[in-house]
A protein has these predicted regions:
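Hydrophobic "anchor" residues on beta-strands that sit immediately upstream
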Residues: 158, 187-188, 212-213
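Conserved core of the PLP fold type I
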Residues: 58-183, 194-209
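Conserved PLP-binding catalytic core of the aspartate aminotransferase-like
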Residues: 275-276, 288-319
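PLP-dependent aminotransferase class I/II
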Residues: 211-288, 293-294
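N-terminal "arm"/small-domain region of PLP-dependent enzymes with the aminotransferase-like
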Residues: 1-65, 73, 155
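Short hydrophobic/aromatic beta-strand micro-patches
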Residues: 232, 303-305, 340-342
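PLP-dependent enzyme catalytic core of the Aspartate aminotransferase-like
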Residues: 318-319, 328-349
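Short, conserved charged micro-motifs
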Residues: 41, 308-315, 346-349
């Protein structure tokens, strides 16, 4: 008898742990959709205030998100309707996990549109739920008839739609997503992790449409290290979610830093605009190269189909540049790589 192995779930034993790339010193990191620098780089007075937060934060007390003022800042900056309630997560990953747990009844199903964010499928498996995968079209657009057919056939309790999509960068047509929301038999999560780089959002619908959850994160706009995601939805969903979320899942430093950052959202928007301009510039340069298929992007990365994804990945790595190799992760991503938009200097390297 093995006292450890014998008590661990068999389905977990065959899972693979999420691998974070080991980054040697001096590498240009274009693999994880992070911003290329501190969001307040160059603003010395703000950096000084930022540093003082650590001294002032009441780290001897448990955090109380509702009393921190973060909800009010989120509503003001992102236009979250008063009808919607807000939940915070230790990154969007935690919200995905608990939203999945919320509907994990026997025989319940999760529907995902793939290729997309791997944590949707992972959490469905973690809670013993059947995962219904609907492939995208070959140009990474939404196959709406297939999605509607899958909804009718499988009656999923939970549907995840990344808007814009990761890892493709393509944003589906809004009217198609609206049709999915109307057709759904359960909860629809519109994951807007990359919404800051797109011109459209479903946040105005949060609280108005009972079965809709709109999820966002501050990771992609310069604060990946704070690990804060947020969701907005109707009270009928959020009241139930509140029962299972850990009571102190956000730490005092993250709450204080996030609130401070949102007060200076104009600077954050300037950083976003700079990255969007760089995205256009890099896209135009890639389109000049032969034998590449460059997909349109509404995120802070560009997905490209190349003749030899493995060879390109290794060549760039030898030159101390790290990108994400998508090849092998899904049939539609054959010979694809994903390139995060960095600074102008990083992009020109």
């Amino acid at each position: 008898m093995n006292r450890v192995a014998d008590v661990i779930r068999d389905d977990i034993k065959v899972m693979t742990a999420y691998q974070v790339a080991d980054l040697p010193e001096g590498f240009i990191k274009l693999d994880a959709m992070e911003c290329p620098h501190h969001p307040f780089a160059g603003y010395e007075s703000l950096l000084s205030e930022w540093a003082d937060l650590a001294k002032q934060a009441p780290i001897h007390l448990y955090p109380h998100a509702a009393k921190s003022g973060i909800y009010e800042e989120l509503r003001e900056v992102f236009g979250i309707p008063d009808k919607a309630e807000i939940a915070l997560g230790n990154g969007s990953d935690e919200l995905i996990q608990f939203l999945t747990m919320l509907v994990a009844k026997p025989n319940a199903r999760v529907l995902g549109i793939e290729p997309s964010f791997v944590m949707y499928r992972h959490n469905a498996a973690l809670y013993g739920m059947e995962y219904v995968s609907v492939p995208l079209n070959t140009d990474f657009t939404l196959n709406l008839p297939a999605v509607l057919s899958a909804i009718e056939q499988h009656q999923p309790s939970l549907i995840f739609i990344a808007y814009p999509n990761n890892p493709t960068g393509v944003c589906f047509k809004r009217e198609e997503v609206e049709e999915v929301i109307r057709a759904a038999t359960g909860i629809v999560v519109v994951d807007e992790a990359y919404g800051a780089f797109h011109h459209d959002s479903f946040l105005p619908w949060a609280g108005e449409v009972e079965n809709l959850v709109v999820m966002r994160t501050i990771s992609k706009i310069g604060f990946a290290g704070l690990r804060m995601g947020y969701a907005a939805a109707s009270p009928s969903i959020m009241g139930e979610l509140a029962k299972i979320l850990p009571p102190y899942n956000m730490n005092q430093l993250s709450l204080a830093a996030a609130k401070f950052s949102l007060k200076h959202h104009q600077i954050i928007q300037q950083n976003i605009d700079t990255l969007k301009n760089e995205r256009s510039r890099v896209m135009n340069e890639l389109l000049k190269l032969n034998r590449l298929e460059v997909f349109p992007s509404e995120a802070n990365f560009i997905t490209v189909c190349v003749p030899d994804a493995n060879g390109l990945f290794e060549t760039l790595k030898q030159n101390r540049i790290l990108i994400k190799k998508l090849h092998g992760s899904h049939p539609l991503l054959d010979q694809c790589v994903r390139i995060t938009i960095g600074s102008a200097a990083q992009n020109d390297a």
